[in-house]
Regions:
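Short, amphipathic alpha-helical "lid/cap" segments that border enzyme active or binding sites
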Residues: 93, 189-194
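Small-molecule kinase domains that catalyze NTP-dependent phosphoryl transfer to phosphate-bearing small molecules
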Residues: 56, 61-66, 71, 145-190
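Glycine-rich phosphate-binding P-loop
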Residues: 8-24
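Extreme N-terminal starter segment of soluble prokaryotic enzymes
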Residues: 2-5
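Conserved phosphate-donor/acceptor-positioning beta-strand/loop module used by diverse small-molecule
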Residues: 118-141, 146-154
Length: 195
């Protein structure tokens, strides 16, 4: 039986998590968001909170850290100190590959589109929306005060873009990297699930 793997990348406030959960329910397959974080925390020994927030702190990449490799005083062998954000990414990537190998799933965020880019059963979706609509959702549905919502939207989207660029070399939200791009301000949540 063919697997159905759907990855969902999304702008903050576009309703991606809700859409992912509803889509998975409609298809009768599991949805992974927080579970990726929990499993990656187990594998890496890092806290789930650190892994969950790593996108906002993405300032360096594995390739940068390779250039910072140092010799230890105990051995003449070159050793690499892997930055914690890189360790978190690698742990999440391993979990995402395991999920996809196990069977059908909806996987939200975490560069899953890039990690599974060569999987023939994967469909990659990017969800975006009009700024005002996303702000409304952040305020009304997430319960964030208006002024804080504006700053959160800016910071989280910037963090996601930096994180994506750091680990994929590509531009987050670039339509050429996805199979489907939907403006949830136009489709609404039910329309996005139906699409």
């Amino acid at each position: 039986m063919k697997r159905t793997i759907i990855t969902i990348s999304r702008e903050y406030g576009s309703g991606g998590r809700t859409i992912g959960i509803l889509l998975a329910k409609e298809l009768g397959i599991p949805c992974y968001d927080r579970a990726v974080i929990e499993k990656a925390a187990e594998k890496s020994g890092m806290s789930p909170e650190f892994i969950e927030n790593v996108e906002e702190r993405a300032t360096s990449s594995f390739f940068f850290n390779l250039s910072q490799a140092t010799y230890t005083s105990f051995t003449p062998v070159l050793t690499y100190e892997v930055h914690p954000t890189d360790r978190a990414f690698f742990a999440q990537a391993e979990v995402i590959r395991e999920i996809a190998a196990h069977g059908s799933a909806v996987i939200i965020g975490r560069c899953a589109d890039y990690i599974l880019r060569d999987d023939p059963d994967a469909i990659h979706i990017f969800l975006h929306g009009d700024r005002e609509d996303r702000l409304r959702r952040i305020i009304e549905e997430y319960g964030v005060p208006a002024q804080e919502a504006k700053e959160q939207l800016k910071q989280i989207d910037k963090g996601r873009a930096n994180y994506y660029k750091s680990y994929t070399g590509g531009n987050w939200g670039d339509a050429r990297r996805y199979d489907v791009c939907l403006n949830t301000s136009r489709t609404g949540i039910p329309g996005a699930v139906a699409a």
